[in-house]
């Protein structure tokens, strides 16, 4: 591959500052505080409707927002630090994507969900939704980790966030599906979007960088930090925007038990599939989280604790099997280079979660939900749909998510192939020193080795 220029001195400032300038202008024109964060409107409501400060939605939602925010910036960031020479980039590019993504998604989701009287009204719930949208982009980032420049990642974020907003609006508002924890809108969409981008950006000579694609002892320990943070806070992620009361309570419980069961299944299958009965840290770091994905759609439904445990067990099994057998096939046969294995942690468990949601919706009755049907399945509650119809619409939503992911990934992949974004060469992948000042002179030495190992005819 020829013609590479990884120097970010002009490219990165232009993209970062220009996009931030545009975002600020759009915020100035369109974005306003919602009625619970606007000083005049909130105090008028307190005076006219005898509302207390303690009833402000901030106090109900902010604890969940904190947990979700930690997942986005620490959980996802450190989960990707397993690469031995890519720790700076894993954490910091995650930081960059999330910082831009949450601003852009505030605008995109605001146009679809919070646009009134020509303005976007934002509050604590819109901040949570912006983090959710960013989570989908970070999942896609995992599929192309180590093989893209920061400018490519910013461009991917810009377009993917826009497509996420459209996809989410269609699924939730037009199809009328339920997906509070994002099995379809976040995990399935983000995973398959990233996989298709990775396929379009396929590198024939990635073997030149394979020696850096693995982990070392301390990098796997750092990645486990991300795993533990994600595992602890996933109940908040799935329940953050569900209705107050029993819905949120039930979602936390279902996620809690699903994750626990998934972890045991992961340990068991990891040892079972190893000829010497040893555990694989890749499985523990990733597959143990699949239980949270698997109940993203059904978490607020009457899944039952044992049903959540079954879902988690299945997710753990599927994820470990995927890492062991499917990832190599995707690489060798389908030419999909999935660095983090997002297909196994988010893709397949996301589809499983969508199917579980469709099955549970099929059995939604007034006897089971009572008056709670209005919160969980409002279209069944008001007679617009039967449980069978809701189940079919849940399945249709999965197809919509997959369709947007595949088509969107194709378009974005071809855009990112343009030679102006400073992508690393095949011999420079998975290497921090390409884009970072690495302390102690280590970066210069390592980059010299990288360049010297590259064939002469591939030099820019």
From Swiss-Prot:
Ranges facing Extracellular side: 32-62, 109-125, 172-179, 242-252, 305, 369-394
Disulfide bonds: none
Transmembrane segments: 11-31, 63-83, 88-108, 126-146, 151-171, 180-202, 221-241, 253-273, 284-304, 306-326, 348-368, 395-415
Domain of life: Eukaryota
Segments on the Cytoplasmic side according to the record's topology features: 1-10, 84-87, 147-150, 203-220, 274-283, 327-347, 416-460
Pfam families assigned to the protein according to its UniProt record, in alphabetical order: Ammonium_transp
SUPFAM superfamilies hit by this protein: Ammonium transporter (SSF111352)
Annotated function: Functions as a specific ammonium transporter.
Protein name: Ammonium transporter Rh type B
Lineage: Eukaryota, Metazoa, Chordata, Craniata, Vertebrata
């Amino acid at each position: 591959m020829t013609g590479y220029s990884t120097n970010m001195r002009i490219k990165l400032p232009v993209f970062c500052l220009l996009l931030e300038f545009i975002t600020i202008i759009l915020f100035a024109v369109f974005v306003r505080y919602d009625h619970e964060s606007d000083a005049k409107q909130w105090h008028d409501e307190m005076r006219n409707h005898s509302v207390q400060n303690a009833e402000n939605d901030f106090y109900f939602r902010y604890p969940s927002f904190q947990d979700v925010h930690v997942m986005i910036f620490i959980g996802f960031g450190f989960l990707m630090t397993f690469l031995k020479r890519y720790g700076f980039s894993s954490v910091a590019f995650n930081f960059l994507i999330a910082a831009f993504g949450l601003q852009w998604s505030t605008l995109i989701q605001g146009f679809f969900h919070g646009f009134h009287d020509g303005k976007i009204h934002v509050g604590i719930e819109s901040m949570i939704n912006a983090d959710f949208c960013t989570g989908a982009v970070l999942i896609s980032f995992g599929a192309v980790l180590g093989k893209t420049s920061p400018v490519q990642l910013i461009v991917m974020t810009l377009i993917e966030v826009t497509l996420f907003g459209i996809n989410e609006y269609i699924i939730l508002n037009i199809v009328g599906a339920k997906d509070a924890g994002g099995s379809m809108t976040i995990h399935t969409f983000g995973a398959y979007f990233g996989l298709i981008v990775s396929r379009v950006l396929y590198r024939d000579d990635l073997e030149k960088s394979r020696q850096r694609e693995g982990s070392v002892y301390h990098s796997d320990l750092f990645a486990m930090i991300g795993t533990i943070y994600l595992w602890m806070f996933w109940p908040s992620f799935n329940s953050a925007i569900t209705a107050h009361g029993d819905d949120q309570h039930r979602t936390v419980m279902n996620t809690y038990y699903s994750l626990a069961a998934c972890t045991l299944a992961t340990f068991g299958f990891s040892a079972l599939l190893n000829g010497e009965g040893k555990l694989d840290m890749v499985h523990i770091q990733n597959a143990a989280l699949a239980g949270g994905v698997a109940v993203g759609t059904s978490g607020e439904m009457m899944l039952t604790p044992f049903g959540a445990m079954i879902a988690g067990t299945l997710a753990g099994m599927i994820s470990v099997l995927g890492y062991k057998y499917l990832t190599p096939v995707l690489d060798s046969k389908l030419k999909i280079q999935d660095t983090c294995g997002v297909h196994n942690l988010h893709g397949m468990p996301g589809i499983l979660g969508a199917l579980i949601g469709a099955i549970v919706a099929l059995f939604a009755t007034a006897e089971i939900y009572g008056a709670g049907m209005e919160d969980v399945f409002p279209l069944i509650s008001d007679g617009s749909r039967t449980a069978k119809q809701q189940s079919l619409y849940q399945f249709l939503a999965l197809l919509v998510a997959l369709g947007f992911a595949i088509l969107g990934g194709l378009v974005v992949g071809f855009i990112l192939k343009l030679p102006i974004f400073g992508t690393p060469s095949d011999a420079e992948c998975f290497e921090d020193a390409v884009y970072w000042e690495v302390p102690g002179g280590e970066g210069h030495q390592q980059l010299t080795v990288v360049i010297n190992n590259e064939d002469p005819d591939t030099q820019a």
